[in-house]
Regions:
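Structural motif corresponding to alpha-helix initiation and N-cap regions
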Residues: 25-28, 104, 128-131
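Non-catalytic C-terminal accessory region of glycerolipid acyltransferases
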Residues: 121-237
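Soluble, non-transmembrane catalytic domains of enzymes that act on hydrophobic metabolites at membranes
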Residues: 1, 12, 16-19, 140, ...
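Catalytic core of membrane glycerolipid acyltransferases/transacylases, capturing the structured
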Residues: 35-121
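Structured helix-beta-strand junction loops
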Residues: 19-20, 37, 113-114, 140-141
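Helix-to-loop junction immediately C-terminal to a conserved catalytic motif
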Residues: 13-47
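Amphipathic alpha-helical segments that form well-ordered structural scaffolds
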Residues: 12-15, 106-110, 176, 226, ...
Length: 237
């Protein structure tokens, strides 16, 4: 496995945030059954909460998928404003964009430091780059963290990730099972992770192992459906 090093500054930030934002982690022992580089963590979004909790508390090496717009300085502000900040009623409207501009350099530094893989949604040709980078990372022994919820699947006039529970999924990520098998000759394991804000708890469930005996589309849908069902059940607990 190629060692994945995070900059000292990123490690310090994680350590500090863990101290001021403590959580419990359940199910970490389940990861011992899987090989490094075969694991795809599939986590709920919960607005910004899921990514923060997962990044801080998943107990293994991984590289996260991050929307490409979150890695481009000129696009972060508007993306985060409409995805999350617009709905934060406790914050005066006139402060929202200036606050996002203030934290943009910090976010870019963090995403670079955790070796994030850009996701080019709505750009089919560029999206293939996402899959190539992911397969390269898995070949090198790095696990992957994915947040597959669709922020746009809401009633008309509304957008953004749902605050509680699990929203509808994009299912394309599940093709990584077939791709990992075809390219790296290993079975991917899709591991559900639910971040519960109310309980301050990150729960890791049993993994769903890719089955190469199934048809490509059948297996993609099976994996995506099982993951959604598992995460939805975890949200109700």
């Amino acid at each position: 496995m190629k060692e994945l090093q995070r900059p000292r500054g990123v490690r310090a930030i994680v350590k500090t945030l863990r101290a001021v934002y403590p959580h419990k982690v359940e199910g970490a022992e389940k990861l011992q059954a899987y090989e490094q580089g075969d694991v795809l963590f599939i986590c709920n979004h919960g607005e910004i909460y899921g990514p923060v909790a997962a990044m801080l508390y998943l107990p293994t090496v991984f590289r996260p998928w991050v929307l490409s717009r979150m890695m481009i300085r000129d696009e972060i502000v508007e993306h985060m404003y409409y995805g999350t900040m617009e709905r934060q009623k406790w914050l005066p409207e006139k402060w929202k964009r200036p606050l996002l501009r203030l934290i943009t350099p910090f976010l870019v530094y963090l995403f670079e430091g955790v070796h994030a893989i850009p996701v080019y949604r709505g750009q089919p040709k560029e999206l293939m780059k996402t899959f190539r980078l992911t397969l390269d990372a898995m070949r090198d022994g790095h696990n992957i963290l994915i947040f597959p919820e669709n922020a746009d699947e809401h009633e008309e006039g509304k957008s953004g990730f749902i605050k509680d529970g699990v929203g509808d999924f994009y299912t394309g990520f599940a093709m990584l099972g077939m791709m990992h098998w075809a390219r790296n000759k290993r079975r991917a394991v899709f591991v559900p992770v639910y971040a519960n804000k109310r309980k301050r708890l990150v729960t890791i469930d049993d993994g769903i192992v890719f089955d190469p005996e199934n048809g490509t589309n059948e297996e993609k849908l099976r994996i995506a459906q099982m993951l959604h069902e598992r995460l939805s059940a975890m949200a109700r607990e």
